[in-house]
């Protein structure tokens, strides 16, 4: 069965992709999502400011889960110098969508 689809000009093998969040919070998790078969990979949101995340920040029960993190707890430098290159080296060509910032400053610095 062909599940391929187009998303904003990208051709995906299937329409499944993770949301920006804890499941894609570093290069190891990005690779895990690729290996799990996602059609595209989305990073955890990267900001110009490090997040200070109070713990616990994830709550759930049998019917739902809530996450209160705003963006990555890692610096933009760690993403640019470590996580993204590590993922790209292991990627098989599937699209990588980088979630960046919340502010005008974030956009100016990160894009």
Explain the meaning of each model-derived region.
Residues 2-8, 12, 17, 22, ...:
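Active-site entrance/lid segments in N-terminal catalytic domains of soluble metabolic enzymes
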């Amino acid at each position: 069965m062909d599940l391929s689809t187009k998303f904003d000009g990208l051709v995906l093998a299937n329409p499944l992709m993770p949301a920006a969040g804890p499941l894609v919070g570093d290069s190891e998790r990005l690779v895990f999502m690729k290996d799990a078969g996602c059609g595209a990979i989305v990073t955890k949101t990267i900001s110009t400011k490090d997040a200070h995340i109070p713990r616990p920040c994830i709550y759930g029960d049998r019917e739902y889960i809530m996450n209160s993190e705003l963006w990555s707890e890692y610096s933009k430098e760690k993403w640019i110098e470590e996580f993204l290159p590590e993922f790209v080296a292991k990627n098989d060509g599937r699209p990588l969508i980088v979630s960046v910032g919340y502010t005008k400053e974030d956009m100016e610095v990160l894009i």
